[in-house]
């Protein structure tokens, strides 16, 4: 790999974010669980490799911090995007950005648990373009045959 190719790959890695919406919160005795609509099928690295991705509250970052795990709605013990994070006390409907996911988005995503893949959006300043459509349930069963 040339230096320029490496630079391009590095930029892609740093440029991508996974934008997710808070569904609800569970309050535990030692920490909270923030359940979001993204899951391990959207970003497998934290569950598979215990990788660290910074998580930023997109809305209302001025709230007090809570210690929380950020987890998906898939019924798996490994369905987490971040563990033991100090994060503003976000509420349902608010958004979180999981950072540095550009090189790991669609290429490592799956349809696990019959979940359609998320769309990909290219943002250039104030402009944006959908570069990969959100999958539908029809996409999931395309190619299947009745027997």
PLM-predicted stretches and their roles:
Residues 2-147:
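Charged (often Lys/Glu-rich) extended helix/loop segments that serve as interaction or gating elements
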